[in-house]
Regions:
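Non-transmembrane, aqueous-exposed alpha-helical and coiled segments at domain scale
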Residues: 2-472
């Protein structure tokens, strides 16, 4: 099915222009009303108030560990031990339903098969599938990949945005209207919606990218029918490349990335957002859209693009990539806010939980190396490894005392670029993969927790006497 993108976007742009004019007109306000903009309090609260009231800022304890807000059987993100009340760094470990992530990835790769579907089944059901169960699950995913003509007629209008993550939110909310019982809260309905999301979101994300390209070119938007029997990784590459113009190695590496991003505990911002909404017993589409909105934030899911920009900056300003002293000196400039974006951050280094190692980063490094060599990108890959090795010492030299290790984002952007994935899809692919974890956590919150999440905020305001309007 094809749509005239130029016509669609012209209609939207005309509407947007009217909105901009209306907004500018609304800004023609009296000087007295400027307080509406300049009177907004933006000063941070006195640090002493947080200590006085024992506030767990960011739901973190004073030692940086997370406040325990619930129990889960879905995954374990381990990066330290607590001994005698103190945080003791440890090698990172990620287990999904009790299974080590390295074992899940390595076994799928050793058997030369795609593993994301197995991980999704494991997360949703709580057990590893046998071959018959896995084949049946993949068959159901294939059946759900199709987007109905009625949905596609509406969906192109939702693709008008500078952010594909914003498009995904609206696309997910639109699916509510095509569900016969969208507010049903039963295990059967939740599993059906989860499978629907796992199947459709990869194509929706890729289609949203194609629509934005069509807008720039003034061409039609084509919605190809899904090809039966393809894995999630193959489905994504098929839409992006307009056919099967990709290698098995490329699809297998993308599959590894999907597996590594599928789940990462209940306390990360997007999963917690999904659980917060689910605790109110709202519909799954609303909870999933909220999780996507959280992941869109640059403090959560948007770091991989920053890492790519930083790598490009380092390659441009370091003349000899093999000179460790020169690389370390430039990393020092970044920390001193004299290079790159001026934030003083080395992106891709450090994590809220992992201290000595991020197991996902180690898996990324292992599987990316061979494809980088095949694509003649070995020197760029070696530079990233050099950054990973040198950055912790450079950061210690700048006074940082906590253990620092590379996180998965250090390699993610490089891998996606190597696979030809456009930067605008980096975070959307994160969302595509994480839908498995979000779905599992939503069901656990709905059927095991049975209580709405409602923390408290301590008021730090003084009582005031009301003045009549004429006396102000």
């Amino acid at each position: 099915m094809a749509y005239d993108a130029k016509k669609i976007y012209y209609r939207f742009d005309d509407h947007l222009s009217r909105l901009v004019l209306d907004y500018e007109a609304s800004r023609q306000i009296s000087p007295e009303s400027e307080n509406l903009y300049h009177g907004l309090p933006t000063d941070p609260y006195d640090e002493g108030l947080f200590v006085e009231h024992n506030v767990k800022r960011g739901l973190r304890n004073a030692d940086g560990s997370g406040v325990v807000a619930g129990l889960t059987r879905i995954s374990d993100v381990h990066g330290y031990n607590k001994i005698d009340g103190k945080v003791v760094p440890d090698q990172g470990k990620l287990t999904l339903r009790g299974y080590n992530i390295e074992d899940l990835v390595n076994n799928a790769q050793a058997e030369n098969r795609y593993g994301y579907e197995e991980v999704a089944y494991l997360l949703i059901t709580g057990s590893l599938p046998n071959k018959e169960e896995l084949d049946g699950f993949c068959e159901r995913l294939g059946a759900f990949r199709h987007l109905s003509d009625e949905y596609v007629k509406e969906f192109p209008m939702t693709t008008v945005s500078s952010s594909i993550m914003n498009v995904l939110q609206r696309a997910v909310l639109l699916l509510y209207a095509f569900d016969a019982e969208p507010d049903a809260i039963t295990p059967e309905h939740e599993i059906d919606v989860a499978i629907s999301m796992l199947a459709r979101l990869p194509r929706i994300a890729a289609f949203a990218h194609m629509a934005s390209v069509a807008k720039r070119r003034g061409s039609e938007v084509h919605v190809p029918h899904p090809t039966p029997g393809l894995s999630t990784a193959e489905t994504i590459l098929q839409v992006l490349r307009g056919g099967m113009a990709f290698t098995r190695d490329e699809a297998m590496l993308l599959d590894v990335m999907l597996m590594l991003h599928a789940e990462h505990g209940g306390g990360n911002n997007s999963t917690f957002a999904c659980r917060v909404l689910s605790s109110s017993a709202t519909d799954p589409y609303s909870a999933d859209a909220a999780a996507i909105g959280s992941l869109k934030g640059p403090r959560h899911g948007g770091a991989n693009a920053k890492v790519v920009s930083m790598h490009e900056d380092i390659r441009a300003h370091v003349s000899n990539w093999e000179d460790e002293d020169e690389v370390a000196a430039y990393l020092g400039k970044i920390l001193d806010k004299q290079a790159f974006d001026g934030t003083g951050l080395i992106y891709g280094m450090g994590h809220a939980v992992y201290t000595l190692s991020d197991p996902r980063a180690e898996v990324c490094r292992h599987y990316a190396r061979s494809l980088a060599a095949k694509k003649d990108l070995g020197e760029e890959f070696a530079l990233i490894e050099r950054i990973e090795r040198l950055a912790p010492q450079v950061m210690r030299d700048h006074g940082m005392t906590k253990p620092i290790c590379a996180n998965i984002d250090l390699y993610t952007g490089f891998i996606y670029k190597m696979l030809g994935v456009p930067e605008t899809l980096f975070t959307p692919l994160f969302a595509v993969a994480r839908m498995a974890g979000w779905s599992a956590h939503r069901m656990e919150e709905l059927f095991c927790a049975h209580r709405i999440i409602r923390p408290a905020y301590r008021p730090v305001i003084e009582p005031l006497e009301y003045k009549p309007l004429a006396d102000r």
